[in-house]
Regions:
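C-terminal helical "tail/cap" subdomain of flavin- and related membrane-associated enzymes
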Residues: 1, 288, 304-392
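Residues at the starts of beta-strands that form the adenosine-phosphate
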Residues: 2, 25, 210
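Conserved N-terminal helical subregion
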Residues: 3, 18-20, 45-159, 163-177, ...
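Short beta-strand micro-motifs enriched in acidic
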Residues: 124-125, 204-208
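Hydrophobic residues embedded in beta-strands of well-ordered beta-sheets
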Residues: 129, 200-201, 210-211
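Flavin-dependent oxidoreductases
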Residues: 171-204
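FAD/FMN-dependent oxidoreductases across multiple families
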Residues: 186-187, 196-199, 206-207, 215-288, ...
Length: 392
């Protein structure tokens, strides 16, 4: 059988890896002009890490990890107001750049990626699916997988108006990386953040004297500004800490990542021989902090259902039934976490800082950190294990 996968991000690459090894022919297309090595730090754990283990990638990801085990909040003068240190003995968390994870996956995928290409039209019949690509070619396959992100073109073609599936969470996010040895050494291997009502700015050091910046802004209007860099300077330039300095060197897109914070909610993830994967159908948002892990888990489950099957339409429905309830749980967690990560008022910031101080007490930190972890830790079981009343 053959699958066309639209989207060569974490979800699409993970699915390609598994389908190739179960005998499928895979064609990967990606609308970006080249591999995207950008993105912010992700804390990779739980089901995604279990999938990486099954793929033989865990040790390679460990070699790329950043030893970030402290979250520190500072004021406008850079003085620490509260902090949280990861207690020993917790489940393994690998802090890694999204681009490093994607590169690790792509290095092990056999199928080449056709870049600067998307889909113009989709036609289905009882025997397969035919797509018209933006380069003018037509391709046919047994299954089309839309793994092309929250603003999915495949979703729009198969399900109609794509925006109706988006749940805007009232915030916009930006991220970029700059080289600065002095600031990188000052921040060190920890997440350091400054929060004022409606605005959050964070920084963490990377290898090679680089510094990563992350910005989160409360914004009722979902429209992306025409000049994102100028928008960041206008809102954050007077907040103190390291912000005036780093914002003078803020690049323009694409070096500057800027987007809405959204979730994608859908009743159905497939339409015949077209199935959605990753953020195209299950975006959990930055607030949930579990997107890459859930994307890899979903790809593994879809591949598990497709392996050896003769009916990809039925396999797509089984895949949705296995993971959609967990995605809903993680999305609800993300919406609850907004008031913690992006406090709307001063009293919310004070309450959060006091909670962090309490969490530092002996015996409390483990309970507190566990409360910040969404579900999904029992997802990675084969279809035979799911069907068994006594899974191994």
């Amino acid at each position: 059988m053959k699958a066309i996968i639209c989207g060569a991000g974490i979800a699409g690459l993970t699915l390609a890896w598994h389908l190739e090894r179960s005998g499928w022919e895979v064609e990967l297309i990606e609308r970006a002009p080249a591999f995207r090595g950008s993105g912010y730090m992700i804390d990779f754990y739980g089901p995604g890490l279990q999938v990486a283990e099954r793929m033989g990638l865990r040790e390679r990801l460990r070699a790329l990890r950043y030893p970030v085990d402290e979250l520190s909040y500072v004021d406008r003068d850079g003085r620490q107001t509260s902090h949280l240190t990861m207690p020993p003995g917790m489940q393994e968390v690998i802090s890694v750049l999204r681009g490093d994870l994607a590169r690790t996956l792509q290095d092990d995928v056999r199928s080449p990626v056709r870049y600067a290409t998307s889909i113009d039209s989709v036609e289905q019949d009882s025997g397969g699916v035919t797509v018209q690509l933006t380069d003018g070619t037509r391709r046919r396959a047994d299954l089309l997988v839309g793994a092309d992100g929250a603003h999915s073109r495949v979703r729009e073609l198969a399900f109609g108006d794509g925006s109706r599936h988006l749940r805007y969470l009232g915030h916009q996010v930006a991220a970029y990386i700059l080289e600065d040895r002095r600031l990188s050494e000052r921040i060190g291997m920890r997440y350091q953040m400054l929060t004022v009502p409606g605005l959050m700015a964070g920084a963490y050091a990377l290898r090679d004297d680089r510094l990563a910046l992350l910005f989160l802004r409360r914004e009722p209007e979902p429209r992306i500004p025409g000049d994102p860099a100028a928008t960041l300077r206008r809102h954050y330039g007077e907040l103190g800490w390291i912000l005036p300095e780093v914002l003078t060197r803020c690049p323009d897109p694409p070096e500057l990542y800027y987007d809405q914070v959204t979730q994608v909610e859908m009743e159905r993830w497939s339409q015949g021989r077209v199935v959605l994967l990753g953020d195209a159908c299950q975006a959990v948002s930055l607030f949930a902090g579990h997107g890459a892990s859930m994307a890899m888990a979903a790809a593994w489950i879809l591949a598990d259902e497709l392996a050896g099957c003769e009916d990809p339409v039925a396999a797509a429905l089984r895949y949705q039934r296995r993971i959609q309830p967990t995605i809903g749980e993680v999305q609800r967690f993300g919406r609850r976490f907004i008031r913690w990560m992006a406090p709307a008022g001063r009293r919310h910031i004070i309450a959060r800082d006091w909670m962090l101080r309490l969490a530092a007490l002996p015996g409390v930190s483990r309970l507190f950190v566990n409360s910040l972890s969404p579900g999904g830790h029992n997802l990675i079981r084969s279809s035979s294990e799911v069907a068994s009343p006594h899974p191994a």
